[in-house]
Amino acid sequence: MSTVNELVNRVDETYDVLQIEKEIGLDNIALSDLELLATGGYSPLTGFLGKKDYDSVVETLRLANGSVWSIPITLPVTEEVAETLKVGEEVKLVNGGNVYGVIQIEDIFVPDKEKEALLVYKTTDEAHPGVKKLYERPNVYVGGAIVLTKRFENNPFPSYHLDPIETREEFKKRGWKTVVGFQTRNPVHRAHEYIQKSALEIVDGLFLNPLVGETKSDDIPADVRMESYEVLLQNYYPKDRVFLSVFPAAMRYAGPREAIFHALVRKNFGCTHFIVGRDHAGVGDYYGTYEAQEIFTNFTVEELGITPLFFEHSFYCTKCEAMASTKTCPHGKEDHVILSGTKVRELLRNGEIPPSTFSRKEVVEVLIKGLKKEVVTE
């Protein structure tokens, strides 16, 4: 493991993989993890977790060396594949017939998945999408340092797909000393906009970093979301104060733990601050509304290396005639229009147009067009 402030770089496209015979097939989650490990997005990790680090992360939200890390980044293989592997071997990492990297095997172990589910997701309920995915993936984990030997082709968002070293450079070029990161898997609605702009009042720049890796089936597709972010930024944000780039990771839906993970990753991308709103990275009713904020009290800002900014649930108040939160609005619930990505999705899928208090009209137009296309292709 590298030191906390150092950006890991394990990309080497000249690496000779021809002599390596054995291979491990990567699913989409492991493939996106491979890229983020190699480009420093997951610094200080240099590879998939071995047993010692895995146990430590699951039980204590820290690596074995004490560094804060809250989500186990693992490489699952089947029992059949595991039987062919040995510690000390170098093995190719493949997906769709392409070799994307290699792993130097340091560990092969069988995890206690029920324990992982309970501690990471706070539930063993298979209706939870993160738990479901955990149980679906193979049952043996392979740990070890990796090298990314081939960059991904057919990247759906090439102009927005930047490595941490590139986003850091971009912020520097813009003269931003303080940058706030915002994680989203939903189209940006008015409550998000209010929070982002409130944060923008106290920092130099906003880094809008939507997740475009694997998400659950009823989330709005990434290409539709990206178009919605583009029209929003074009029409309602100062161009020199906002930067848009994608986060290629898969969504874990691990609530509080994922909030810590998202903050650590944005630190690697160059952020000094990170927005944590209500039910960050949550799903259903598995986590408390502000549980993802409360978990940060277990860590100092120094050891995280990034400052979390906590925001209460915001809403449109018909009496204030403005976006507000309980901190700024004295009126009762009957005057509050509660906004959420789930509600916007629900309205759109029912063929209803969300009111302007929910979403900007340009965003709604993009979403309607995108969802019509989705219906046609289903």
UniProtKB/Swiss-Prot annotation:
* GO molecular function terms attached to this record: ATP binding; sulfate adenylyltransferase (ATP) activity
Pathway note: Sulfur metabolism; hydrogen sulfide biosynthesis; sulfite from sulfate: step 1/3
Q: Which InterPro entries does the entry mention? A: ATP-Sase_PUA-like_dom, PUA-like_sf, Rossmann-like_a/b/a_fold, SO4_adenylyltransferase_pro, Sulfurylase_cat_dom, Sulphate_adenylyltransferase
Q: Which Gene3D superfamilies match?
A: HUPs, Sulfate adenylyltransferase
UniProt EC number: 2.7.7.4
Q: Name one GO biological process term.
A: sulfate assimilation
Lineage at the top is:
Bacteria, Bacillati, Bacillota, Bacilli, Bacillales
Q: Does the entry annotate any disulfide bonds, and if so which pairs? A: none
The UniProt keyword set, sorted, is:
ATP-binding, Nucleotide-binding, Nucleotidyltransferase, Transferase
What is the catalytic activity of this protein? sulfate + ATP + H(+) = adenosine 5'-phosphosulfate + diphosphate
This protein is called Sulfate adenylyltransferase
Which gene does this sequence derive from?
sat
Originating species: Bacillus cereus (strain AH187)
Q: Does the keyword ATP-binding apply?
A: yes
Family recorded in the similarity comment = Belongs to the sulfate adenylyltransferase family.
